[in-house]
Amino acid sequence: MNILFAGGGTGGHLYPAVAMAERLEQLYPGTTVAFVGTERGIEATEIPRLGYRLHLLDVRGFRRGFSFSDMLNNAGVLLDFVRAVVKAAGIIRAEQPDVVVGTGGFVSGPLLAAAELMGRKTLIQEQNAFPGVTTRFLAAFATEVHLSFEESRKFFRRKQGVFVTGNPARSFTGIDQAEAQSFFGLQPGLPTLLVFGGSRGARSINNAVKTWISGAAGKANIIWQTGSLDDERLRKEVEPSATLWIGPYINDMRMAYGAADLVLCRAGASTLAELTNLGKASVLVPYPYATGNHQFFNAKALVDAGAAELVADADIALDQSRTKVFSILADPELRLRMREACRKEGRPEAALDLAGRIAGLANIK
């Protein structure tokens, strides 16, 4: 069975594809997996590191404005898209995939379009409650569309071939907390806060956490993924310690989640899938410029379930936000209630279910 995945730009689009690929390889030995991405996305480094073959397309997104500059840019984007579809068709002829799977990001569009024009079986996996424009358009022609939220159905005209299977997430279970804390050089036994804002980082979160370090010393461990955007600056301003690990990227998220009692992060759908599958208490800071404000709606679902707290991006630097975070970190009973509520929202079998659907499309039993 040959499967070709397209998805990336950010971890939110890439890691669901990786989760499905890993499960396919576990369930169906001999499966061949390849990826299509861009050189600007996280996939350019992550996919080779994971040992998969990667094809690159040159594609970028449309601007949403109506100025002359925006329209000129979008004309170029459209031309790039057509060229990318032609190149994607060549990749499909070379790989001969049984199924082409798209998980979002700019690169999914041309590969899915080429696959659908060539009559290949296609599966779209949408992570967010508010599907993107490309997903909604290509879904009309896809063999199957898989959603993470029931409420997303209303955005699609078609009724057949649309399923709610959840968001496939990487598996991070089976880690002893004290071992994980020691892995980061931290003090076992202290409550531990895990902070991250994506591969590039979140400047608002980084600036807030920088002011929290001195007050947390001796009371809590902090594992802080700064992202590439602020790494150089923060390394000059903040020193690691026995209670602080700081770095641009965490290569072993299994250990990071295993060490954490509370997670402070954005509210991307893939991150929330990982949190709910693990049952991790969290304070969510939705990215305010996400399309359709979808991170807010992703976060609200967990907040309404009692599984998380929400802090607006504009408020993260306020004293009350710091107080909220460290109050939860210091309250084991509250964290337990949040963990239990969070686990109820998870769909840990999503990767398994989707692997089965992909195999079914490939006529593999």
UniProtKB/Swiss-Prot annotation:
Disulfide partners: none
Binding site for UDP-N-acetyl-alpha-D-glucosamine: T10, G11, G12, N128, R170, S199, I250, Q295
Pfam family, one: Glyco_tran_28_C
Pathways involved: Cell wall biogenesis; peptidoglycan biosynthesis
Superkingdom field: Bacteria
Membrane topology: Peripheral membrane protein
Keyword Glycoprotein tagged: no
An individual GO BP term: regulation of cell shape
Catalysed transformations (reactions): di-trans,octa-cis-undecaprenyl diphospho-N-acetyl-alpha-D-muramoyl-L-alanyl-D-glutamyl-meso-2,6-diaminopimeloyl-D-alanyl-D-alanine + UDP-N-acetyl-alpha-D-glucosamine = di-trans,octa-cis-undecaprenyl diphospho-[N-acetyl-alpha-D-glucosaminyl-(1->4)]-N-acetyl-alpha-D-muramoyl-L-alanyl-D-glutamyl-meso-2,6-diaminopimeloyl-D-alanyl-D-alanine + UDP + H(+)
EC number: 2.4.1.227
Cross-referenced InterPro entries: GlcNAc_MurG, Glyco_trans_28_C, GlycoTrans_28_N
Example of a GO cellular component annotation carried by this entry: plasma membrane
KW Cell membrane (keyword) present: yes
CDD domains: GT28_MurG (cd03785)
Molecular function in Gene Ontology: UDP-N-acetyl-D-glucosamine:N-acetylmuramoyl-L-alanyl-D-glutamyl-meso-2,6-diaminopimelyl-D-alanyl-D-alanine-diphosphoundecaprenol 4-beta-N-acetylglucosaminlytransferase activity; undecaprenyldiphospho-muramoylpentapeptide beta-N-acetylglucosaminyltransferase activity
Subcellular location: Cell inner membrane
Keyword line: Cell cycle, Cell division, Cell inner membrane, Cell membrane, Cell shape, Cell wall biogenesis/degradation, Glycosyltransferase, Membrane, Peptidoglycan synthesis, Transferase
Gene3D superfamilies found in the cross-reference section: Glycogen Phosphorylase B (3.40.50.2000)
Family indicated by similarity: Belongs to the glycosyltransferase 28 family. MurG subfamily.
NCBIfam families found in the cross-reference section: murG
General function of this protein: Cell wall formation. Catalyzes the transfer of a GlcNAc subunit on undecaprenyl-pyrophosphoryl-MurNAc-pentapeptide (lipid intermediate I) to form undecaprenyl-pyrophosphoryl-MurNAc-(pentapeptide)GlcNAc (lipid intermediate II).
Name under which the protein is recorded: UDP-N-acetylglucosamine--N-acetylmuramyl-(pentapeptide) pyrophosphoryl-undecaprenol N-acetylglucosamine transferase
